[in-house]
């Protein structure tokens, strides 16, 4: 993997920085693990915008990634590493001994030909998936389940990981990359190691068009709008917002907590804001 500063042949390429990985598969993805997905452009079933700044972008196939890793005791061989347009991490196509192929999130250091295993008897090695009760305290993990059997939901982005801090009864304590310490049931599964493609955060888009390829539309400042469109809008000429920063619906935009899921609050040992 290499960081490449693009030759400045145009203003759009002058600031562009790419992450190049020559180990990624250059051909087509595995067709049996592809699914079609239509672009919603941020609209719901009523056609109304529910997520702003979305629309356009290149057409993509969804790669069906195995987040459960439930084929216990069956060794798998890494056939190739692939780019996935739907996520920041790369994915790996693995071939199980029974002939089935699946995509998984590619951990850091994974190589073609490497053997992987899942289940409680799997060795503690990067890429292997085990129940948390079988993982030693202090191990770096990723792709962590929040409910047993539901599939990995935490620490799935490029370069992310978590640390297994302790086990108390039927729960374990995991410190996430944000600094939050969270309780997770010991029957939940996690994968050893950290997610690969850690240099993803070093890339520079370089030009607005590159974001349009990704389906990201421009973000207009509130002070540039009319009063009917935003609380910061209006005024004669260029004027300040006149109040603390808020969203278009009046919610404070800087540091205001909006989490409302009280049902799982007991699972958070330490908030990420209280480091």
From Swiss-Prot:
GO molecular function: rRNA binding; structural constituent of ribosome; transferase activity
Pfam families (alphabetical): Ribosomal_L2, Ribosomal_L2_C
Comp. bias regions, Polar residues: 35-49
Gene Ontology biological process terms in this record: cytoplasmic translation
Keyword Ribosomal protein: yes
Cellular component annotations (GO), alphabetically ordered: large ribosomal subunit
Basic residues composition bias: residue spans: 50-59
TM region positions: none
Keyword tags: Ribonucleoprotein, Ribosomal protein, RNA-binding, rRNA-binding
Sequence segments annotated as region (Disordered): 35-59, 224-275
Gene3D superfamilies: 2.30.30.30, Nucleic acid-binding proteins, Ribosomal protein L2, domain 3
Entry-linked InterPro entries: NA-bd_OB-fold (IPR012340), Rib_uL2_dom2 (IPR014722), Ribosomal_uL2 (IPR002171), Ribosomal_uL2_bac/org-type (IPR005880), Ribosomal_uL2_C (IPR022669), Ribosomal_uL2_CS (IPR022671), Ribosomal_uL2_dom3 (IPR014726), Ribosomal_uL2_RNA-bd_dom (IPR022666)
Subunit field text: Part of the 50S ribosomal subunit. Forms a bridge to the 30S subunit in the 70S ribosome.
Summary of the function given for this chain in its UniProt record: One of the primary rRNA binding proteins. Required for association of the 30S and 50S subunits to form the 70S ribosome, for tRNA binding and peptide bond formation. It has been suggested to have peptidyltransferase activity; this is somewhat controversial. Makes several contacts with the 16S rRNA in the 70S ribosome.
Family (UniProt): Belongs to the universal ribosomal protein uL2 family.
Protein name in UniProt: Large ribosomal subunit protein uL2
Organism placement in taxonomy: Bacteria, Pseudomonadati, Pseudomonadota, Betaproteobacteria, Burkholderiales
